[in-house]
Amino acid sequence: LLRGALALGLAALTLTAYWGLWRCDFVEYDDREYVTGNPFVRGGFTWSGIAWAFRSTEVGNWHPLTWLSHLLDCQLYGLKPAGHHVTNLVLHLGNTLLLF
């Protein structure tokens, strides 16, 4: 019972942190490198994009799952920030619940 209440509380906290995402734009911190200014990501979920995701070290990191997520976001939502933010919310909620 305590474990379930704690999981629910953490999920609620995560939802609270992301609540304003519906009206937010892309941010200037790193979204240009990761999404809006990246031709591979903007091209969506393609075979060449998938191959690029696994060999890319752009932004100084090798993280193909992050790139695959961005590729899929652009495929599904284009450059509409709310969709990208919803994906982040789902991923963070999933990670929160994986604690249990």
Which functions belong to the PLM regions below?
Residues 86-100:
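Transmembrane-helix motifs of polytopic, lipid-linked glycan transferases
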Residues 21-78:
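Extracytosolic (periplasmic/ER-lumenal) interhelical loops and adjacent juxtamembrane/interface segments
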Residues 13, 29, 87:
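Single, functionally critical "micro-switch" positions that shape active/binding sites
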Residues 1-16, 97:
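Start-transfer (signal-anchor) and selected internal transmembrane alpha helices
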Residues 14-21, 74, 99:
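Structural signal for membrane-spanning alpha-helices in multi-pass inner-membrane proteins
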Residues 10, 26-27, 84:
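Residue-level signal for helical boundary/lining positions with a hydrophobic bias
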